[in-house]
Every structure is written in structure tokens, then in C-alpha cells.
Amino acid sequence: MGKLTLLLLVLLGWLQYSLWLGKNGIHDYVRVKNDVAMQERNNSKLKARNDQLSAEIDDLTGGQEAIEERSRSELGMIKPGETFYRLIIDKSKENTSRPSTPNNTQ
């Protein structure tokens, strides 16, 4: 019975070594798992970017809204019958209207 027990202990030791330190062991599993998680995060970011670019391409090829928006913002164009209002903030009134805080030196 002693030889069988010794053989089983050696086999158990070898299996534990292979599991923890050997090729494709726990260490490699954790590393690959982390690599996969990082790649999935990267893929989801790239997919969101691709979806956004795809929607913009669809809008530019078929829709007039994007063309109209760029014409308004970049070129300052307006439609016939529209009135354009530009609001300009008066910096001198903005500075004087703020309440001044007293300097308390003690």
C-alpha cells in the first residue's frame, strides 16, 4: 500500500505544479483573461466610434439636416424668411454688475 500512496502523492504533486506553474496554468489563464477583458473594452470603444461615424456618413449622404447644420454654423447661412439674431455679451457691464467682496484682514 505504501508504493501506491507514494505514487499518488507524486502524481498529485505533478498535477498541482502543472496547474499553478506549468504551461497553460492558472498564471497564464489570469493573464489571458485580463487581456481579453482589455480587448473587449477597446472593441466596445471602437464599435461606438464606428457607429457614430457610420451615422454621420448616412446623414451626409442622404440627409439634408447635416448639410444645413454645417451651412448655418460654419458659413453663417440662413433660410429665406428667417431672421438671424446674434447676442453679444457686454463685458464692461458684466464686470461692474458683480458684487464686490470686501477684504477682511484680521
UniProtKB/Swiss-Prot annotation:
Membrane-crossing residue ranges in chain numbering: 4-21
Gene3D superfamilies: 1.20.5.400
Coiled coil: 29-70
InterPro entries: Cell_div_FtsB (IPR023081), FtsL/DivIC (IPR007060)
Position of the signal peptide: none
Membrane protein topology class: Single-pass type II membrane protein
GO process terms (BP): FtsZ-dependent cytokinesis
UniProt key word Cell division: yes
One of the Pfam families matching this protein, by short name: DivIC
Predominant location category: membrane
Cellular-component GO terms for this entry: cell division site; cell septum; plasma membrane
Compartments in which it is found: Cell inner membrane
Periplasmic membrane side: 22-106
Residues on Cytoplasmic side: 1-3
Entry keyword set: Cell cycle, Cell division, Cell inner membrane, Cell membrane, Coiled coil, Membrane, Transmembrane, Transmembrane helix
Main function: Essential cell division protein. May link together the upstream cell division proteins, which are predominantly cytoplasmic, with the downstream cell division proteins, which are predominantly periplasmic.
PANTHER family found in the cross-reference section: CELL DIVISION PROTEIN FTSB
Summary of subunit composition and partner proteins: Part of a complex composed of FtsB, FtsL and FtsQ.
Family that this chain belongs to: Belongs to the FtsB family.
UniProt name for this protein: Cell division protein FtsB
Gene: ftsB
